[in-house]
Amino acid sequence: MTDKPFWQTKNLNQLTRSEWESLCDGCGQCCLHKLQDEDTDEIYWTSVACTLLNPETCQCRDYPNRKKTVPDCIFLTPEIVDEVDWLPVTCAYRLVAEGSDLYWWHPLVSGSPETVHEAGISVRGKVTAFDHDMQDDDDYLDHMVTPDKIAR
């Protein structure tokens, strides 16, 4: 009998810190700025990345200190995964919370951190600007995209 991987046997609250961190697929989509319509609460995606995102690796340049540098950085926890409605449908945290399995390209499944990029899921090659390039809020409108433009 083969043991099932941890993401198939545990819920998010049961994960160790190491398991939690490994669940991130490294796509970088959570590091893109989203706009929210004040009237409808609809979420709009942009191709503007957080200043800390490395657009090639799709990893944070200063992960341990990100909240100090970027105070409004979302610190995902098991408690808020269900509340964050802009998480991509491909997000492993969302998938596990919903009781779904990970996709073939997830590094925990494929064994390679490159498959998330090869599958076109990551933001590699899709970042058009960084938040420090934006002069005012209206500048973000020039970089609005549909989520399918981010993940193939």
Curated annotation (Swiss-Prot):
InterPro entries: Puta_zinc/iron-chelating_dom (IPR005358), UCP006173 (IPR008228). It comes from the Bacteria. Pfam families: CxxCxxCC. NCBIfam families: PRK05170.1-5, PRK05170.2-5. Belongs to the UPF0260 family. This is UPF0260 protein BAB1_1496. It comes from Brucella abortus (strain 2308).
